[in-house]
């Protein structure tokens, strides 16, 4: 979920598997409990069985934290969200828990009339009241400043204190939002609702203010080509987009991302778009669609000594490109895309996870069978990747089913391409880099998921730095 990534970036905390749940997971848990006999043969109902499962998920974290944030997706009135709203209603009645319910609404602006319309917000709150929930704070998304009369009207008709109606206006940068919310009093309204005294919990916005200053004082402009197949929906690469921005801020650079659809561009138009780019990045993905365009982009970066960054599938395709065009291995490819005896990338059948061996074959279900989550990698000293991380052992998040075939490693190293990062057991290549190239790195993991605005990922900082100096 996109919002989960925003929470990670703004709180500087990495989410756990238990930090997100879907309706499907809730219903699956209920059905499993019924099969086990936990309900003693009683008829399964949305209330109490489904709502109790939702409450159990929420309560599981409350014991260990001072404040927990829970976001319910969707729109008030959606059938899918009703059990979640009911669970929230029940939890709100628990006298041992202080809570604050924030309702996000949209305030449309009619340019022809020159006024903001609060009626949709009033009806939205009415829908919530029908579900037995009274919001404590209303966040008002708007493209225009919200006048005092509109705020007073929302307060009056929605049973919310005037100081708890918070404008949430568009900002030039998402990293201005904490300062804007504080300006309109969100922090004080929230603390009061949760039973805290605002004067005892002063908000430290200095890091965010300093970040805004760095953004405004950027000296360089750098053009980065991101060659993928999901570029029509840029939010598909949201974490990647933000990580590049973070790397740019750290280098005092404004990153101009050129989104290139690898499936729709022919080789001639692709080369035209890549020309003039300071760096080329191939992101992760699945499936054969669009891979030829990505491979051609990697070849262009390699032959023209342009900084190249391959992530997950991007690293695997770099291995394929080098195998085909440098090592001259006939029919070199990935078993994900082509049946060949020269699979330089193949399906993993087993790997170590927390001291346990996980196994899978080609007939296994795809769901839940990936090498998924945080895994360690050991970096070779005197490598570029080691100089970037400044650590021998790193931990990064993974999401893949295919891995570089170890049988070909020596052939790559003989041509100046070596695997400078491996899994702790030495079986799975994690990092590819080139001795001949100024900056040519492929990683099997997803570093973008750990980049933060106040703590940018070192790989993206190094990549943008190399692109500036190109």
Named regions from a protein language model:
Residues 1-253, 263-279, 286-287, 293-300, ...:
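Flexible phosphate-sensing "switch/lid" loops adjacent to ATP/NTP-binding sites
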Residues 158, 190-198, 326-330, 463-470:
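Short, hydrophobic alpha-helical segments
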Residues 163-170, 258, 422-425:
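Beta-strand->loop->alpha-helix junctions that form or flank phosphate-binding loops
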Residues 273-375, 382-384, 453, 459-468:
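Cysteine-nucleophile active-site neighborhood
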Residues 365, 372-470:
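C-terminal and late-domain segments of enzyme folds
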């Amino acid at each position: 979920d996109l919002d989960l990534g925003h929470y990670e970036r703004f709180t500087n905390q990495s989410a756990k598997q238990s930090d997100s749940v879907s309706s499907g997971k809730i219903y699956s848990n209920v059905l499993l409990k019924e099969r086990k006999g936990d309900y003693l043969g009683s008829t399964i109902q949305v209330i109490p069985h489904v709502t109790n499962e939702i409450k159990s998920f929420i309560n599981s974290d409350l014991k260990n934290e001072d404040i927990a944030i829970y976001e319910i997706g969707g729109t008030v009135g959606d059938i899918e969200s009703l059990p979640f709203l009911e669970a929230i209603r029940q939890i709100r009645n628990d006298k041992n828990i202080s809570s604050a319910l924030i309702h996000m609404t949209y305030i449309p602006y009619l340019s022809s009339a020159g006024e903001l319309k609060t009626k949709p917000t009033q009806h939205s709150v009415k829908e919530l009241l029908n579900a037995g929930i009274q919001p404590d704070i209303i966040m008002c998304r708007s493209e225009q400043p919200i006048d005092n009369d509109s705020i007073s009207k929302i307060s009056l008709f929605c049973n919310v204190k005037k100081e708890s109606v918070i404008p949430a206006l568009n900002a030039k940068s998402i990293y201005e939002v904490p300062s804007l919310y504080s300006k309109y009093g969100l922090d004080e309204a929230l603390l009061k609702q949760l039973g805290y005294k605002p004067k005892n919990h002063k908000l430290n916005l200095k890091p965010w203010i300093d970040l805004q200053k760095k953004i405004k004082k950027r000296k360089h402009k750098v053009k980065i080509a991101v060659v993928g197949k999901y570029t029509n929906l840029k939010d598909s690469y949201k974490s990647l987009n933000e990580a590049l921005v973070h790397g740019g801020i750290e280098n005092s650079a404004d990153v101009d991302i050129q989104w290139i659809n690898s499936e729709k561009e022919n080789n001639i138009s692709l080369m035209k778009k890549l020309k003039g780019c300071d760096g080329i990045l191939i992101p992760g993905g699945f499936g054969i669609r669009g891979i030829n365009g990505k491979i051609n982009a990697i070849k262009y970066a390699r032959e023209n000594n342009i900084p190249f960054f391959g992530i997950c599938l991007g690293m695997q395709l770099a291995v394929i490109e080098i195998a085909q065009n440098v090592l001259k291995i006939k029919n070199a490819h990935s078993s994900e895309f082509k049946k060949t005896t020269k699979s330089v990338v193949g399906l993993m059948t087993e790997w170590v996870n927390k001291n346990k061996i996980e196994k899978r074959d080609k007939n296994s279900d795809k769901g839940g069978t990936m090498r998924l989550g945080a895994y360690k990698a050991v970096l070779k000293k005197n490598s570029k990747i080691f100089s970037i991380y400044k650590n021998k052992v790193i931990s990064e998040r993974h999401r893949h089913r295919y891995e570089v075939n170890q049988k070909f490693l020596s052939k790559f190293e003989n041509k100046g391409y070596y695997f400078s990062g491996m899994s702790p057991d030495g079986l799975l290549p994690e990092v590819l880099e080139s001795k001949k190239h100024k900056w040519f790195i492929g990683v099997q993991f997803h570093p973008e998921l750990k980049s933060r605005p106040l703590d940018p990922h070192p790989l993206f900082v190094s990549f943008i730095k190399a692109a500036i100096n190109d």
